[in-house]
Amino acid sequence: MAAAAASASQDELNQLERVFLRLGHAETDEQLQNIISKFLPPVLLKLSSTQEGVRKKVMELLVHLNKRIKSRPKIQLPVETLLVQYQDPAAVSFVTNFTIIYVKMGYPRLPVEKQCELAPTLLTAMEGKPQPQQDSLMHLLIPTLFHMKYPVESSKSASPFNLAEKPKTVQLLLDFMLDVLLMPYGYVLNESQSRQNSSSAQGSSSNSGGGSGIPQPPPGMSFYAAKRVIGDNPWTPEQLEQCKLGIVKFIEAEQVPELEAVLHLVIASSDTRHSVATAADLELKSKQSLIDWNNPAIINKMYKVYLGDIPLKTKEGAVLKPELKRDPVSTRVKLKIVPHLLRSRQAAETFPANIQVVYDGLFGTNTNSKLRTLSLQFVHHICITCPEIKIKPLGPMLLNGLTKLINEYKEDPKLLSMAYSAVGKLSSRMPHLFTKDIALVQQLFEALCKEEPETRLAIQEALSMMVGAYSTLEGAQRTLMEALVASYLIKPEVQVRQVAVKFASTVFPSDHIPSRYLLLLAAGDPREEVHGEAQRVLRCLPGRNRKESTSEQMPSFPEMVYYIQEKASHRMKTPVKYMTGTTVLPFNPAAFGEIVLYLRMCLAHSAGVVPTSQSLADMQDHAPAIGRYIRTLMSSGQMAPSSSNKSGETNPVQIYIGLLQQLLAGVGGLPVMYCLLEAVSVYPEKLATKFVDKTEWIKSLMNNSKEEMRELAALFYSVVVSTVSGNELKSMIEQLIKTTKDNHSPEIQHGSLLALGFTVGRYLAKKKMRMSEQQDLERNADTLPDQEELIQSATETIGSFLDSTSPLLAIAACTALGEIGRNGPLPIPSEGSGFTKLHLVESLLSRIPSSKETNKMKERAIQTLGYFPVGDGDFPHQKLLLQGLMDSVEAKQIELQFTIGEAITSAAIGTSSVAARDAWQMTEEEYTPPAGAKVNDVVPWVLDVILNKHIISPNPHVRQAACIWLLSLVRKLSTHKEVKSHLKEIQSAFVSVLSENDELSQDVASKGLGLVYELGNEQDQQELVSTLVETLMTGKRVKHEVSGETVVFQGGALGKTPDGQGLSTYKELCSLASDLSQPDLVYKFMNLANHHAMWNSRKGAAFGFNVIATRAGEQLAPFLPQLVPRLYRYQFDPNLGIRQAMTSIWNALVTDKSMVDKYLKEILQDLVKNLTSNMWRVRESSCLALNDLLRGRPLDDIIDKLPEIWETLFRVQDDIKESVRKAAELALKTLSKVCVKMCDPAKGAAGQRTIAALLPCLLDKGMMSTVTEVRALSINTLVKISKSAGAMLKPHAPKLIPALLESLSVLEPQVLNYLSLRATEQEKAAMDSARLSAAKSSPMMETINMCLQYLDVSVLGELVPRLCELIRSGVGLGTKGGCASVIVSLTTQCPQDLTPYSGKLMSALLSGLTDRNSVIQKSCAFAMGHLVRTSRDSSTEKLLQKLNGWYMEKEEPIYKTSCALTIHAIGRYSPDVLKNHAKEVLPLAFLGMHEIADEEKSEKEECNLWTEVWQENVPGSFGGIRLYLQELITITQKALQSQSWKMKAQGAIAMASIAKQTSSLVPPYLGMILTALLQGLAGRTWAGKEELLKAIACVVTACSAELEKSVPNQPSTNEILQAVLKECSKENVKYKIVAISCAADILKATKEDRFQEFSNIVIPLIKKNSLESSGVRTTKNEEENEKEKELQLEYLLGAFESLGKAWPRNAETQRCYRQELCKLMCERLKLSTWKVQLGVLQSMNAFFQGLMLLEEEHADPEALAEILLETCKSITYSLENKTYSSVRTEALSVIELLLKKLEESKQWECLTSECRVLLIESLATMEPDSRPELQEKAALLKKTLENLE
């Protein structure tokens, strides 16, 4: 054994020595490279030898080699082989360690293209190797990435790096790439430099312990990372830039998962080199929408890179090695990372990294203002998005950081603003952090005072956000806050005061008196933003009902009054008091005004009514209640606290009145005047008496410049005066009469007039009251006559001003008379001359229609008229007055009609009217007429006039007015027996007005109907309902119509189209009520519907319909389940009237927002049902309602309804009406969005159910729809669902994919098919290619590709049969091309799973291969090329046999094309499969290469395909033929035996090619080929048969030596010649030409003498042609003559050439034919065209070359002399041919040959002197030849001839 080992070792050493020797002998680089390529890999393998000597020898050799290589950088190493060797799992580590050295050395030397080619191998080689070696390989790979070419469409099959199955390698590569991207340019790893030395440059994180000896790495890297990137050969900055660009390109090409590479792009985008940063930025932007920034993997990586390896307290032994510890990245990179963190919710939640990033950005050593700004943005982001649980631990740290920044950093106002804003946001998220820290509030207030203007806004915003945190303060904290707010309310900065107001209004409860006081002071602020906010807060009313408003909502009136009084008295002693003229006020007027209004609100609130300060009229409604409260306060004797008891007044009411008086005296003001009037009027007995001595002051108020002020003052005066009696009263009235008549000042007259009227009125009221209370006639009789006269005088004085030229005084007189008349009979005569009651009535009535009068005058005149019968039970002109009021309607005066309505009501009922009450002390409801009052009720008469005359008037304005009066009567006199007894007539009247075109008329009528219904008893109500329903729904006339001649419904208003107004709204309401089986509900609906703006006015509000509506809403509540669906739809009705009405009802009924969700199913059912209603209006409203319903609510419960909704909307999308179509489109778009959201995988089972429900509908109905918009939306939805649903699509793929494939053709514009049919073949192919390309990039294909990602064996079983069916029977280019594309994708997505189905798919694709459309054919071939990779061998064999059969047997070009395309595709995409079946494929390819190409057809392209297949898969053509010779001969034989002539010819060409390329064929193949070819020759001539002849000639020429041997089954030369010569006798001229040429070639090759037979065929034809060409022209047309000439020419040329070739070396034969042949040639030389001359000369050259007479041993001087003479005579023609140089050239060659031969045979004497002279003369003519070489040659030959003489 030892001996054997020694021997083997010696052999190895000897081998190594020989290699050494060869290396030594290598002189050139090329030689050295060849030796290295051959021997380096095996030499390295010797390192695994067990023999020390061998290993030593190898090392010596390698040392020598290294020296040689290093000095020669161009020498290439066998890197590919070395990489294979390196990957060998059996190789020992010693070998691999050395192998990688040479890989590292050789790889960078390779051309770039080769490096790119080997790049994937480098990656593969890394698997399982030691870390340093992996680093080395990556160092080689990274520079190559820049040069790599990636496919445009990324797919796994086309990807150069197939990384899907190598997750570990991917991770290694990504880590290395990240380090490369982090590496700064020009960085040098200085071993002497320690980390600690550069701590200042590294920021907060470089303080890493225990690494003092390790050099400082670049930011973001560890020492180890830097070292491995630098490697053995550090990159220059330019190379590093290229590497980084290469990495970005690599990521762009999607070679690694997008998720993994996000961080790399972010890092690259921060690069200092523009090219890298721009490329990365662009890529990041393009992927922005695809990246999930909430993915924890991405965010954690970003944090890790940003922060580096932070030393945390870890378990023992878990501390990171110093050289592996990564530093944080540079500020530049941080600036790129943080913006991406800002996109991420996950980043905000990740603790503790989020807070570390914040602190690093704000306070890190290396931070800058940009980073600080971004960090603050991140704080904002955390505050907004971080969930409650996760923000809790962050709060204190964030707050500390922000306060620290605010305190320390003052340079950048913008930054400070952000910091303050962040504090505000933090407070709104975590109020508990701030609640106890009032110092922070103070700090911010102070900052607001002192900071720059641009920062103040942020502080203001922050403080506003912080307010909520302090709303629960109590005790000392609250007091502290009060003081704080109070101190800042007086600061000069407006923002400070504004925020202080915010704090005062929000921090404290609304009944907190000190804060309200502060707000009241703020309400007097000069700046609008401050006082506006304060007023808004103060006037914000408590809840409308007592349930809502608790007693705490406003301060109690007494307490608030005392507080104000205390503050006022205190302020009067300080400089803050306000001086105005001679008056001193405790507050400025604005604040004081707000204070008294607020006190009035507190008073109202304490009195139990809703406080309001908006309208004096509204305030007066509450006077009786306030009066009761004031009486209580006055009688309870409530006193002020002792501290405030300094002004003398102790009762809160008195203090309140004192404050009002003070303000009124100092500044005045209408609201203040009203408040004082109200306070006194409600309790005059106690309070008015105090003002008796202040009548002069009151009079001064009556002289105020403002009319309203004078009116209120006059009222006040009358209240005060009414408390006095006797002479005092008399003198006051006389004084008033006097001032009234004094016309110096209209204002004084106006005030006095009003005061006089009000005073007389109050006097009469008191008189009436005394009479009713005491019934004391005697006392009554005691009334002083002079008082009565005075009252009459006063009344007449007032009356005299009715005709005043001043409207002001006329109105005042009218008002005053009204007041007198309201309270008692007018003290003037009824009739007669002068100022009488009749005159007064007529005067006032005449003013109402007058255009000269103002509206105010008219209003007052109407009111006054209405009051006369109220105060006077015996008023004589009551009916005249009422008739006058009703007849005064002219134009449309709505407001006036409401006033007339009120007046008619009051006048009709007379003394029983509520107008008779004292409005200050009694409400309408509380009033009852005095028992003894005389009844003057004319309601029956009024009702009769309105119903029988005015409501049926032809004038629409009169009808409207009558309706309003009727409504007023019904509302105000609801209990009147006359109204109750005429309910049906009144209803009929209201119904008749419903059809008016005027909206208000309709609304008034509908409100009236509601009131009428409420008034009836049960039986009445039933009758009213049935009548109303019948009238509304049928349009029949009402039975209670008064006048048979008057039409109730004017102008065909009933039954108008829905677009019109008319009754449609009420019909709908009636229909709605009927559907609920509750017809009476129509009245409730009417009350809720059409809430006209009029009802919000003072006049309208008096009817109290808001209350009625609320009650109606409550009564309808039980019907909500039936109502909600209908009402929901009606809100979207196209008819504006119906829509508004129904929306009003909806708003009244549906107060709970969750109601829609509660009744979702019912609403949906109603909408879907009505989508196909026969009324367009209903269809449109259903679509719009559905659009609204679907948005923003969970639809999990109605998934099963979705298909029905889709399908119904699809139908509506094709509606006849455009507005309906648009509504349907809107609904469909919303439905699409909702469905896409519901198909999200996060929805779980609901998502699955949604997809299962939707897909059939979208595929079958949507995509197949004839409506373009429906199809487009369906596809769009499917695409979005596929993106959203992801893996959930898998179960539905078998249905989805085929449907989408079908749609590729269905959805294509049909015009393309038309154009395709009309186009040429070339145009058609180009167009179809473009169509298929468009289909492949369509949304449908995008969806299909999405689905394909998730396919596996579980769904393929169902999908494949459908796919096969579609391939076979699918219609359309797009569908078939798409199917092929899907199959290709399947082969790459799930190759193993596809194997069982590949056979079926192949079978289906075969039908596509024979498709007439070339584009489909190519697509199917392409698919087949991929599919064979996954199929079983048996299937592949069957396919190849099928293709072989098609090619050999089918004559149609389509079959041949499909074979070429398929085989080519298999070769390109599944080369391994082709190699496994090479024996079947390559012979066919060889045969295919030799197809005879038709000019017009695509055979040329097919030949190229076959050629490519052949060349790609054989080791050189010669090697291929040798390898597959048997198969090639078999297939060519089969081709020759084919019935197709074309195939026979193709077989022949292939055979010829075999013979040519092998140079020699050996038995038995030669015999087989020749036999087959000769068999083919037998029989008639056919197109292409020439190829057989050419093949025979070719084979014989190539194998002439083999043919000399006699071999069984191999035809002899004689047999071959016999067969070919036989073909020369065929009639077909073209064929004959080829046959003669081939026969000549064979004769030449075999040197056989068959000249006799050959010349017998050829020479007669030459002679015949000569005769024909010189003969008479035939009658054939020019073209035929031309063709015949060409054929003759071709024949002559061929014949002469053949004669030259067939000229034998046989003395006897030559003797027989030399003379004849020479003569023939000479003749043709003289007579022919230049082409024939050229051919003859060439033939002559061959003739003389083989002429034995020119050889010494066969000399015959005489015969030769004769031949030469003949020749010389004829050749002179050619030599002298001046036109064609080619003829002259060939002629010179012949003479040169002759002279050379004569010289060699020494037979000069045979060239006679005659010949020489002829030749010399002809050669002399060439001396001036244009071509120098001919000139020279001619001169040389001439000289030779001359020398002979």
Swiss-Prot record:
Entry-annotated residues carrying N-acetylalanine: A2
UniProt cross-references to InterPro entries, sorted A to Z: ARM-like (IPR011989), ARM-type_fold (IPR016024), ARM_ECM29 (IPR055444), Ecm29_N (IPR024372), HEAT_ECM29 (IPR055443)
GO cellular component terms given for this protein: centrosome; COPII-coated ER to Golgi transport vesicle; cytoplasm; cytoplasmic vesicle; early endosome; endocytic vesicle; endoplasmic reticulum; endoplasmic reticulum-Golgi intermediate compartment
Keyword Methyltransferase set for record: no
Phosphothreonine, modified sites: T836
SUPFAM superfamilies: ARM repeat (SSF48371)
Domain of life: Eukaryota
Record note on quaternary structure: Non-stoichiometric component of the proteasome; associates with the 26S proteasome. Interacts (via N-terminus) with VPS11, VPS26A, VPS36, RAB11FIP4 and RABEP1. Interacts (via C-terminus) with DCTN1, DCTN2, KIF5B, MYH7, MYH10, MYO10 and ARF6.
Family: Belongs to the ECM29 family.
Protein name: Proteasome adapter and scaffold protein ECM29
Name of the gene this protein is made from: ECPAS
